[in-house]
């Protein structure tokens, strides 16, 4: 039986009475954002709106984006990435679970030196897919051209964010490439792997 979104007690500063809010709303107030599902237009717009609002609220305080996503639609994912580059606050990206496809693209899009993967996280990159196989011949040609442009964009961004040569990214994206947290660090998708300490919880490790 589904339990729905957990709710917690929260009181706004200056309010005499506490109220119940869903846990994500509470965490948003601490500038903690979550990408925890497949990427589509609705989720993309929600994250973009939150980043813009929190940026306007305090442009000097960092944002934290936790990524556990199998990927999703390319254009909504690029929209999230572009917003991350546009807003004034630095955005930390933290991978837990899986960051695949556009999820890894967004993970790599965090501020350099502020991208982290949990020790058992998995990262996957591959080329963008399309539904052109259902299209008519003319539509197939147009969509194939568009997908080639999108792939070129993703390849260029991955190269910029990871430091890998463009030809390496291009070849690796031809198939599904899965990486452990340490492999993603070596590849340049993240900067650190979080290491669990008995006394101090998780901390980033070079």
Swiss-Prot record:
GO BP annotation list: protein quality control for misfolded or incompletely synthesized proteins
SUPFAM superfamilies (UniProt xref): ClpP/crotonase (SSF52096)
Q: Which domain of life is it from?
A: Eukaryota
Q: Mostly located where?
A: plastid
Record's catalysed reaction(s):
Hydrolysis of proteins to small peptides in the presence of ATP and magnesium. alpha-casein is the usual test substrate. In the absence of ATP, only oligopeptides shorter than five residues are hydrolyzed (such as succinyl-Leu-Tyr-|-NHMec, and Leu-Tyr-Leu-|-Tyr-Trp, in which cleavage of the -Tyr-|-Leu- and -Tyr-|-Trp bonds also occurs)
UniProt EC number: 3.4.21.92
Example GO molecular function: serine-type endopeptidase activity
> According to its UniProt record, which protein family does this protein belong to?
Belongs to the peptidase S14 family.
How does this protein assemble? Component of the chloroplastic Clp protease core complex.
Query: What's the protein called, per UniProt?
Result: ATP-dependent Clp protease proteolytic subunit
Organism for this UniProt entry? Solanum lycopersicum (Tomato)
Q: Please state the gene responsible for encoding this protein.
A: clpP
């Amino acid at each position: 039986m589904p339990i729905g979104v957990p709710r917690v007690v929260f009181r706004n500063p200056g309010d005499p009475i506490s109220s119940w809010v869903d846990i994500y709303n509470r965490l948003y107030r601490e500038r903690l954002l979550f990408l925890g599902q497949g990427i589509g237009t609705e989720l993309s717009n929600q994250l973009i709106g939150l980043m813009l609002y929190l940026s306007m609220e305090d442009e000097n305080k960092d944002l934290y984006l936790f990524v556990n996503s199998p990927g999703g639609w390319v254009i909504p994912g690029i929209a999230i990435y572009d917003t991350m580059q546009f807003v004034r606050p630095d955005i930390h990206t933290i991978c837990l679970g899986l960051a695949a496809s556009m999820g890894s693209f967004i993970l790599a899009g965090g501020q350099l030196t502020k991208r982290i993967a949990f020790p058992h996280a998995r990262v996957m990159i591959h080329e963008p897919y399309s539904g052109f196989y259902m299209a008519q011949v003319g539509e197939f040609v147009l969509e194939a051209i568009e997908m080639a442009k999108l792939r070129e964009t993703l390849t260029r961004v991955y190269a910029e964010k990871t430091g890998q040569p463009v030809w390496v990214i291009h070849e690796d994206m031809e198939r599904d490439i899965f990486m452990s947290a340490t492999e993603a660090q070596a590849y340049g998708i993240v900067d650190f792997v979080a290491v669990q300490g008995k006394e101090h919880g998780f901390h980033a490790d070079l």
